Amino acid sequence: MNWEMVIGLEVHIQLSTKSKLFSTSATKYGQHQNTQAAFLDLGLPGTLPIVNKEAIRKAVIFGLAVDAKISKDSFFARKNYFYPDLSKGYQISQSTNPIVQEGRLEIETSKGLKTIRIERAHLEEDAGKSVHGYIAGETGLDYNRAGTPLLEIVTYPDFRSAEEVVAYLKKLHQLVKHLGICDGNMQEGSFRCDVNLSIRPQGQAKFGTRAELKNINSFRFIDKAIEYEYARQVSVLESGGEVVQETRLYDADANETRSMRAKEDAFDYRYFPDPDLLPLVITDEYIESIKKQMPLKSEEREAVYREHLAEQEVEFLLSNLEIADYYDKVAVVIGYKPAYNWITVDLISTLNRAEKEFSSDVVPAEILLEIIANVQKDIISQANAKKVIAEYIDAPSAIEAIIEKLGLKQVSDEGMIRELVQGIIAANPQQAADFKAGKTKLMSFFVGQAMKASKGKANPKQVNQIVQEELNK
């Protein structure tokens, strides 16, 4: 019998906010245990939640980016279950009428384009974390993560292969980073995926019994987990057994899924409206104000890049979204191709020599544009621009002061340059004669000698012009 795989996804993205969804605690990753947990995060009596406005804004940004409906009135609800890392005994989430509904994301697969329907995206708070082995033989609880704002993005069961799932997740991962709503760090848990997988005979409309796969933190492991679980369910059904509804844990070392617990349905959580939180009202004016601040959609950005850049250059920018954002700021001022060359040839190569990773904070776009302006005004040469960049990386200060400190101002005095060139021609009579005899490539020799004699300070445009004039006398 031929079996068809049916998959729906639940992706939890941690929103990039400085504070938590309902408390003022910080959300920095990697801090000492329980140093970023307010009384509310610990579930202490008498504490009340206050909604983080920035989390709402980021949820709306996502909804607009996937062409979804933004709910004008949505509600927070209590999702009731017991787990040690859930201090309150419930999680504040959204059940009916979530903030984002009915979106879509188009993916590219080996069979062509496919549209994946997004059923909903709702806000909820993250749970704490169980820490095993910190104290020998015991489990500790770290509530630093408790209350961190999550956006849970739920698809319809539209996937029919692991390839489609990975394509969607990569596209979604790229999108949320591009929008600036999530850093996408899978190792730190900022982008987590649960896979709901079932199988059915090919051509059958009715869905099979699904298993939920958890603990998958890389695209490669997601592919492996899906293929393993598909084979497991086929084996169970073909041997006369029944697939049970359960949550299964993926073990990357053993490349297998293991039963974790029975999978709950929505009614098991006994959702009810949170009495401490008013309905969330979003106006048309608020939505319009966010639309005006939205970056280009990734498809629109890609189309613009392809119009002006080579394929390899486009792929480089699309796979490095922080660099792409930086590039956009520079390109709008000096043009697409010059901006790419300045960033890759001058800036990134200088960063590499300094053994530093690219970050828009190291040399802000405004600083690079100021350096470029000095080159365009013939104040410094293109070659010396790298020295200015390197000095700024090492000790940030005013660009004008760096140019003065390094003595990089170009010499544009025509009389001085002409005298320099005449001296070089006089010192190299054989090369001058060869040039006049037709060996025009020697032009670069004289230009190089002039630039060397001026210690790189002579204006190269003037040097070229004057060398040509003097040799052709």
From Swiss-Prot:
Domain of life where this protein originates: Bacteria
SMART domains assigned: GatB_Yqey
Keywords: ATP-binding, Ligase, Nucleotide-binding, Protein biosynthesis
GO molecular function ontology, one term from the record: ATP binding
Top EC category: ligase
Biological processes, Gene Ontology terms: glutaminyl-tRNAGln biosynthesis via transamidation; translation
Catalytic activity of the protein: L-glutamyl-tRNA(Gln) + L-glutamine + ATP + H2O = L-glutaminyl-tRNA(Gln) + L-glutamate + ADP + phosphate + H(+); L-aspartyl-tRNA(Asn) + L-glutamine + ATP + H2O = L-asparaginyl-tRNA(Asn) + L-glutamate + ADP + phosphate + 2 H(+)
E.C. designation(s): 6.3.5.-
InterPro entries: Asn/Gln-tRNA_amidoTrfase_suB/E (IPR017959), Asn/Gln-tRNA_Trfase_suB/E_cat (IPR006075), Asn/Gln_amidotransferase (IPR018027), Asn/Gln_tRNA_amidoTrase-B-like (IPR003789), GatB (IPR004413), GatB_Yqey_C_2 (IPR023168), Gln-tRNA_amidoTrfase_suB_CS (IPR017958), Gln_synth/guanido_kin_cat_dom (IPR014746)
Pfam families according to UniProt: GatB_N, GatB_Yqey
Description of how the protein assembles with itself and partners: Heterotrimer of A, B and C subunits.
Family of this protein: Belongs to the GatB/GatE family. GatB subfamily.
Protein task: Allows the formation of correctly charged Asn-tRNA(Asn) or Gln-tRNA(Gln) through the transamidation of misacylated Asp-tRNA(Asn) or Glu-tRNA(Gln) in organisms which lack either or both of asparaginyl-tRNA or glutaminyl-tRNA synthetases. The reaction takes place in the presence of glutamine and ATP through an activated phospho-Asp-tRNA(Asn) or phospho-Glu-tRNA(Gln).
PANTHER family: GLUTAMYL-TRNA GLN AMIDOTRANSFERASE SUBUNIT B MITOCHONDRIAL AND PROKARYOTIC PET112-RELATED, GLUTAMYL-TRNA(GLN) AMIDOTRANSFERASE SUBUNIT B, MITOCHONDRIAL
Identification of the protein by name: Aspartyl/glutamyl-tRNA(Asn/Gln) amidotransferase subunit B
